[in-house]
Regions:
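Hydrophobic adenine-recognition pocket in adenosine-nucleotide-binding enzymes
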Residues: 103
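A conserved beta-strand element that flanks and buttresses the S-adenosyl-L-methionine
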Residues: 99
């Protein structure tokens, strides 16, 4: 799609998720009877690779972008839906693992907190988020110049405190510019 949708040149690249999926499988003990939700799934690339690596696994994805879902990978499109991370359309404890990669920091702080609470609510205890973070002023300046979509901009220590404040108990990692 073109840049006005934010997905210009956003195409499937096997090198991104295929090397990571076996680590997910081992860390969370994923198998054909597992269920995984991707919050901020975009076009479903990670879920495609997950389903290809673990046949039979239940995958679901949500994204706020109708454009992304409409242009998702055919192999997983039926398992994706437009939804807001602040109000996930699933019952409590619906998924073995809930993953959200570089998504929640794009929400304002209060909304980000609600999204993290929703991730916690629909998981059966295992979750993983990545967020942009910084450790010093130089990294903060780089992040401000580079990530134009992030609305919750915190240091590593501030993120840890924020996770605790909102009750998010899953795993987490940072992208540091």
């Amino acid at each position: 799609g073109d840049r006005r949708h934010g997905y210009g040149g956003f195409n499937y690249q096997p090198r991104f998720w295929q090397p990571v999926i076996p680590t997910f499988e081992k860390h969370w003990g994923l198998s054909a009877i597992s269920s995984v939700l991707d919050v901020g799934c975009a076009k479903g690339f990670m879920l495609h690779d997950l389903a290809a690596h673990i046949p039979g696994i239940t995958v679901r994805g949500v994204d706020v972008s109708a454009y992304a879902i409409a242009h998702a990978m055919e192999s997983v499109q039926a398992h994706l839906q437009v939804a807001d991370a602040q109000s996930l359309p699933f019952a409590d404890r619906s998924f073995d693992v809930v993953i959200s990669i570089n998504t929640v920091h794009n929400l304002e702080r209060e909304a980000c907190g609600r999204a993290l609470q929703e991730i916690q609510r629909v998981s059966r205890g295992q979750a993983f988020v990545t967020v942009d973070a910084y450790r010093n002023e130089r990294e903060r300046e780089r992040m401000m110049a580079w990530n134009l979509t992030a609305k919750t901009i915190l240091s590593v220590d501030e993120w840890v405190q924020f996770f605790e404040e909102v009750g998010y108990r899953g795993d987490y990692f940072w992208f540091i510019p």
